[in-house]
């Protein structure tokens, strides 16, 4: 997957930008047509030319994995009980009932910020212990939950 490759090679800003653009395009097509499509045209805001309506297919990654991992910046490592939260959005965002392995359930919230360099205000609730690494434009902080 392109986004994963960009992230693994350190191009976090570009991965976030591409993910945000793709997510916005899928949302716009959904709003215009009232359905999710199997695939989308790469250069216009419409379904792909051989796309089936009411068929999630790969599009299902956009409102789940792409939203959580690349827009919200959540990168879980369950075996190590570690969660990296790479905060790039300025808007308030978060996830309720975020599954963390077979037994973990997290509630994650990040308050709105006025600029990327501003330290994020994070609220987390968890039913298990973990290490949370928060990354933002001007810093990094590790918390034990």
Positions of predicted regions on the chain:
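Non-catalytic C-terminal accessory modules of carbohydrate-active enzymes
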Residues: 1-145
């Amino acid at each position: 997957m392109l986004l994963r490759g960009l992230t693994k090679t350190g191009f976090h800003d570009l991965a976030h930008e591409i993910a945000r653009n793709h997510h916005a395009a899928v949302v716009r097509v959904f709003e215009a047509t009232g359905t999710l499509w199997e695939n989308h045209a790469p250069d216009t805001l419409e379904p792909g030319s051989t796309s089936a309506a009411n068929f999630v297919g790969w599009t299902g990654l956009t409102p789940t994995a792409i939203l959580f991992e690349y827009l919200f910046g959540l990168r879980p490592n369950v075996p190590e009980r570690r969660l990296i939260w790479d905060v790039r959005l300025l808007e308030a965002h978060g996830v309720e009932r975020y599954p963390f392995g077979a037994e973990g359930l997290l509630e994650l919230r990040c308050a709105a910020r006025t600029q990327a360099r501003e330290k994020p205000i994070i609220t987390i609730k968890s039913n298990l212990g973990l290490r949370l690494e928060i990354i933002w434009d001007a810093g990094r902080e590790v918390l034990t939950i």
